[in-house]
Structure formats: structure tokens, C-alpha cells
Amino acid sequence: DPSQLLRPNAPILPKPPALVCTMMLPDILICFLLNPVGSPSVLAELLFMFHIVSVSGWLILCLCVLSWRGAMIEAEQGTEPHPSAHRKETARPAELQGPAPLQPVAFKRVERVEAVREAFRHAWKGYRTFAWGHDELKPVSKTYGEWFGLGLTLIDALDTMWILDLKEEFEEAKRWVETELSFSKNVDVNLFESTIRILGGLLSTYHLTGDTLFLDKAKDIGSRLMPAFNTPSKIPFSDVNIGKGTAHPPRWTADSTVAEVTSIQLEFRELSRLTQDPQYQKAVDEVTRRVHRLDGKHDGLVPMFININSGKFTHRGVFTLGARADSYYEYLLKQWLQGGKKEAALLEDYLQAVEGVKRNLLGQTSPSKLIFVGELSHGRLNPKMDHLVCFLPGTLALGAHNGLPADHMELAVQLMETCHQMYAQMETGLSPEIVLFNLKDPAGRDIDVKPADRHNLLRPETVESLFYMYRFTQDHKYQDWGWEIMQSFNKYTRVPSGGYTSIGNVRDPVNPGPKDKMESFFLGETLKYLFLLFSDDPELVSLDKFVFNTEAHPLPIWPSTS
């Protein structure tokens, strides 16, 4: 039974005994303060307390007594130290000054950061063993899947490894990029997906490392994607053959999705800035200008499809912040930030769209009064929300941080609670792909899920927004919510041989139904945002210096002279 592959050896990560003992130190010190050190009863109680925890407790007891006599010993700050870390020498009795012991919150932070590193290593072990150089790992069947045949998972994960300080894994992946990665292939790629994952990943890794290998590869793939823009309307084709230099729409339609053609701008603009070749930015800026002028919007909201021949919106009357439209709104704000807040049309479109969301798409559940973003279909609100929409709290918070209206942050807080509940109200603690909200029955559940929508693809949008919310508020509840999600990933999606798998039913903790696929964005986005959420270091990819593309690849905010 494939589902049983997820059960063994996949517990919620426990606190190591030494960490548990260390976190008891404040109570033990109070006992010493309130009672004579030589009191037999107190010593007996302490010895018993440590004995029942673990043998490690005896070591902590010795440290505790030593600290009482004046020598400060720094507690070990991690559940699994990085291989490059060096243990400090024990202080001599004469060296009485030193750092204060870590408080419980700091211990919690270290534990969580190390848990993300361990999760990445486990996922990478599966990819390295069963799918090396291929696009995606199929962890249950211990094989791989191909989409473009370009090592998507490896490229998507490069900057994550750098940020997590996994230098050994990074160097091995870099060698593959240097010796094996070639874009001279007769293969069709999706313009949007290859831009955000491959071009974005290479540009980000170049900026983090300074290694021109990644910039050279970025130039190569960027130039090969340019035939997509050879259309009558300048709205790009969805697919490009990077070997032949040809492009075409999907086989079933002449339309492209609005999100796909308006969520490639950060990457191509940055490529022009680095190469001093204006063709890339010129192509994507023309798309932005044309969409800015188009008829068919509703209070700043855009339809989901656009025709590559006419350059006009199609399937009008349906408006969503979910699939096919989501990152259009995200990139309005982020392009404005990337360019130094100088492009007024981008800000105008973004602010108008947020007002459109508030006027047309917001609903409230009957039981718990959760605020959600629904879909507008020909004037009627549908209480349906994709997990993808959970990018919005983070985007709203980012805008508010950069001087946009304070009520954007108020809405972000409300929507963040709703996205949290999409996880918390499921039996596995993991969100489904799509939910329906209860508007009528106050005695019912806030959230319902159709059987076809109960899958979880290891998506990043909620933990992405948790990262932004914590960075800007320092409210630890957002870290706690992220930790709950991390634990649920470990419990229900972790495969013992290596990797994590999408699951088919978040409502069934007994048989969640492994789907045997680890999307590249689990390493490129989900684990990266979890690590940044738990890191507590605002300078680790500073949001005042970088803007993340929609695949979580940080690109620099341009200097004022750009």
C-alpha cells in the first residue's frame, strides 16, 4: 500500500533530550534560589527530575551547579549543527563573563531553523538519489518525472541552498550547472514557468553568489525565450521551442493567461539591467503598457485570458485572484518596488486593483466571520478560494511596509487568519487546493472542500505570507502557524527513502493518498520561506534590498541611478 510508505520514520520532529533539559534550566535555578543548595530534599527532587528526562540531564545538572558557582557555560544552540560550525571551547573559571543563556524563544528558533535544514537535506537526498539532473522527483516510486528536461528542481533550489548555508550541496549542484546544463535542446518550454523558475533562479543565484556562471546561463535561456514575443499584438505566446527558436500558443486555444504574460517582467527587466541589452525589458514593458490600457477591467480587476492576435481580454465577466490571474497583481507592486517606486502607472493599477478586491471579491463566513477573497462571475460572488490566493496577505503587507494605505495591512491580517484556518480546520493540518466558504449556516463549518479539490501540492503561498507578516509585525503567532504546517508536512508527506510527496486527501489522516510527486517549488519556495520565517534575521534577504519573484527568487531593488 503506497500510503504506508509515508507512515514509518516520519514523526513530528521531537525536541532532543539535551534541548528539553536545557529548557528546564530556569525552573531549576529558581529551586536553587529558594532553597539552600545543600538541602537534601531539593537535590533529591532535582536528581529525580533529570533522571526521568534522559541521561543528558546529568550533564545539564553539572552545568547548572557550575553556573551557580560563577562559571558561565553557553548552551549548544542547535538540534543539528551545520557541518561547518566549530564548537566553542569551554570557558575557564577565570573567564566569568559571557553571553547570557538562550531564552526559550531562541531555543525554539534554532530548533525550527534546523528542522527546515533537515527537511531540505531529506528532500535533496531523494532528488539526488533518484532524480539527479531531471525536472522532478517521484519519491514514492523512487524515480523522476520530466517536464522540460532542464533540471528544474536543481535550478529552483540553488538559491535556497545558498540561503540555508548548505554549501556542500550547493557546490555539487553548481558543478552540474557548469558541466551538464544545456539549453540547446529541441524542446518546448512554457514561457512563464521557465522564466520564473529557470531565469529567475539563475539571476537570483548570480546575485547571491557573484558567480558569473549563473549570469551566463541566464543570458542563454533569456535570449532563447525571446521568440515568444513575436506576435501581432506583442502579447507573447505561451510556449517556446528553445532549440528551434519558434513559439506557439497552447494546442487548444489562441489565448494566453493574463498571469503568465504579466508575471515575467521582474526577470526580463533585471536581465536587461545586468546585460545592458534593452531588448528584454522593452518586450515585457510593452506587454505591461498594453494591459494597462485595455478595456474589460472591472474596478482594476482583470479577466483571466488574453488573445495573442487581438491583444484583448477574452472570457470577460469572470474575475479571480486565483489561478490564471494571481501574479498579475503581485507583479504590479513588485515591479514598482524593483524600479525604485518611480513607475506611477504600476502603482496606479495596483491600488485600483486592491480597491476592486475590497469592493467586489470579499466575503465573510457565517460561523466564525472569516474574511475571504472569492471569485466574481458575471456580477455574482462565488465563495470559492484557491490556495494560490494566500499570496495576497504577504503582498498587501509588503505594500503597507512601503508606505501604501494602512488598511492594506488590516486586510492582510484578516486574510492571513483565513489562510491559517484553511490548514487548521483540515484533519491533516494541510490546506486543500481549493476551498468553499460557508455563508449561510452559522452552526456549520467555515470551510468545505469538494472531493476533487482535497489535494495538497506542497504549495508555498501561505508560508510565503506568514514570512512577510512576521517580518513586518514580529508577532510570533505567525512563526507558530508556520511550525504547525512544517510538522504536518513531516507527518503526512515525508517519504522515508527521501523526498516529500503531494497528497490526494487532506481530510483523511489515515490514508492521505500520496500522489508521488515533489514539485520543484517545494525546494525553491516552500522550504525557503519557512527558513526565512523562522530565522529572525531581517537582514537575511532584506525586504528593503530585494524583491522576490513569484517563484521566491530574490532579485535586487535597483539603485536610484538605474
Regions found by a protein language model. Give the residues of each.
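N-terminal secretory signal peptides that target proteins for export/translocation
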Residues: 28-29, 41-49
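Compositionally biased intrinsically disordered regions enriched in polar/charged residues
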Residues: 23-25
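Glycan-recognition and catalytic cores of secretory/periplasmic carbohydrate-active enzymes
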Residues: 1-21, 34, 44, 50-54, ...
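Compositionally biased, intrinsically disordered low-complexity segments enriched in Pro/Arg/Gln/His
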Residues: 36-39
